[in-house]
């Protein structure tokens, strides 16, 4: 209702919801008109200009409308995105007729350089248009990809009427959390350290055992095992996925621990409200007084994996999103990085206290105020050496991560004192900075005196930041990978593996393909192909050597000793499936060897004793000790042959079958060399040589332990190939006796490992692979975007990395072609754009700081993404033009016919040769990878820039209504003025109690005479000249119908009581309200949907 049509006696201007919706639809996000504006209210220097808000969010001005051209328009604020709005009563208004004119000032604040402006207009109609436009821009996000984070709504529990939530998972747990005073809690079954190292004297938190029950409504109940009574419950649906974390084993010396709870600093980063554990068991204890986090330890790794995925499915996800775009355009980030801490140097200062108390030094890696990884403790050393690596996989940007170097004093009375020596801030920019990919020494500054350097620390950081689309986008890619010829896929890798300059890149590439084909259940096929590739290379080498009449035995003696895609894949795969086996089979023996600290040295030059008689006696004792340890380890391996995971034995079986085909002479020795290279050299010996790297011990090994384990590994490697020690290491020739005695046992063991003969050994390790795992009763669509079990493989991440690799491989081919053409044409030749994949594209999935934080020099329109709906076929998204660019003429007209058939849904005919089918399938796989690559970069560019909107979004009434629900207001007092402050959401828990939604359920007109019966108000502002305390009255009303629409002539009563803002009516209550029509001409229908249809029909017929 415009001000001109208002009755004079009303003295109140209404801003109805329908006016807001109409303004959005007709004026969109732009505004034009004559407005008074200034930058400083106190100066009262108002200027009257023709102001305009453009479709890109710029607030500009010119002298008048006639001069509003590109040369005369000057910007006031360049970007209104995420602006903050305040409405101030204008006591000094030059507009005298308050009934006909607007006497309010709109204050607009942005984070830019010119960050504040005051606006006032003469008419209420213009005021509403301007306010609508500013509200719209306040909901748009500013530039920078990390500013586009959103958090999903809590998962709603769907069950049958009156049905109780079901129990999804039940576990026995050790819990570190708040100790409830009125409940006797049983002690934990496993003795673990406190995560904070120092014991808490008030005993408010501690370890206890409990039964954990995860229910289908997202509640995790902790129960007493004795009688099943409730200790307390956690509402998992109020947690973020980043607040459910698998703890690094270095924190508690346990690999099966999970952190659950609120991270206030993380929530502050995202601007979210608080969450608290709900203490249900004890009425005497206030839930707000207890800790808001717990740590749970599971008995088995598979239990942790199952529960982790189930909890993640209920938690709220963090994702990047463009306002108004389809959900298939949402992205999650994988912020993966590895921090290596090598050593520190504090030799320039004295670390001892005045009593020379014994101490240890260590480094914590913290983020959001919590410790997530910890180095081992080094005693009484000002130059501590660690060389430890820690892997992190975050879903968010890190804003406040630190390396905290701490000193722990061990007093005589067994009390511990902790001292923070210094800390170094690790930002996201440092993590992604390639300069830290090599060992870098950083200064450590004093905690109290930031200008005083107390030492240095040497670190190395490698990182990988990926932007991942929802799983729906990868459906076609997965189908192609399921049916692809893996030999042709491997050709892509081996063609480019020579360009992989270091082992890290080779390892990363191997893991990508390993994870993908393991998640697709094609892992054995993949190893078949990789082994064929490696053996083909060896066969070619042998043929060339034989042509020269030379001996080729040395080629087979070094079989799989070098690094390749195959060996790196096998290392990762064997340790993944065999980690539990290694732990249960060898960890106890290795700990015993290390803790004994008795030498096994046989080299006389290394024995420090000068007396020859005593030296011989020492060497003899060492020989017995070495023989005993090696015998104990071998017997353990031999006795547990049937416990070795079948996945490992299947790969060894494939390998042996391949070798027996190509090797005619000396087959047994070649097989022994090959099995040794895979099983002993790459599986058993790395764990024996460095048990700390594999988390079997927590402390660094001393020189004696390192040498002992090296000697044991040497003997086992020679045993694995039945090779005698010779003159190269004469002191070890004594151990040839051990090898001779185990000759037959070793052959028997190899036959069992390669399934050449049946293994009748009993299974004695009780591995978790023998335990049946419960099937998670969770919707598959929800599980598709979470890591897969077992092993928590992130399939979508690996598919994103696969896409990146395939495109990079194609770009390498293009570069080679360009060089060839350049040479062939005398430097004048150029590649035609259609001849290569992604030609002319400079896009890359590696992200630099400019992409993340700077505006993109393009006009980002959300509408460009409107057509990118959820689909299994990316060809439908990008259309035929891009597909034509991707086609190559080298296949000929036959290939073009195949392309047309594939894109039109025609299946291959049996007449087409299989080789041509496979070639076409590979071409289609590359094309799909290119499409996904461009899609990711297209969306990422939009996310990096300032948000804008297209015309399609303005037509979406549902979005406009949802926008109205997101706007809050708060009356605040600034000096003598009362200010109405508009907010996109509650900023924090300390916001004023007066903070309310702009559009909520209204109060009955009987209790408020200023509100008419037939009005659905968006905002009501009283313009009467009264006391300042009552000068800014707001009355905010709204209605809900079942389909989410809001209709003009309907007011729902608001239930009284604190904290009821945003509550929704139950269907029963809503139905009762609908039985009483709010207006006389509304039919008395019993159903809200029917009522909605009636309103819609009335609107279409013009209300007749």
Curated annotation (Swiss-Prot):
Q: Name one GO cellular component term.
A: cytoplasm
Instruction: Outline the extent of the C2 domain.
Output: 316-444
Q: Where is this site: Arginine finger?
A: 561
Which residues in this protein are found as N-acetylserine? Answer: 2
Signal peptide per UniProt: none
Which stretches are tagged as biased composition: Basic residues? 1090-1104
Provide a Gene Ontology MF annotation, just one: GTPase activator activity
Q: Which residues form the Ras-GAP domain?
A: 536-753
**Annotated GO biological process:** axial cellular bud site selection; bipolar cellular bud site selection; establishment or maintenance of cell polarity; filamentous growth; invasive filamentous growth; invasive growth in response to glucose limitation; mitotic spindle orientation checkpoint signaling
Question: Other comments?
Answer: Present with 1230 molecules/cell in log phase SD medium.
- Supply the name of the protein: Inhibitory regulator protein BUD2/CLA2
Give the gene symbol: BUD2
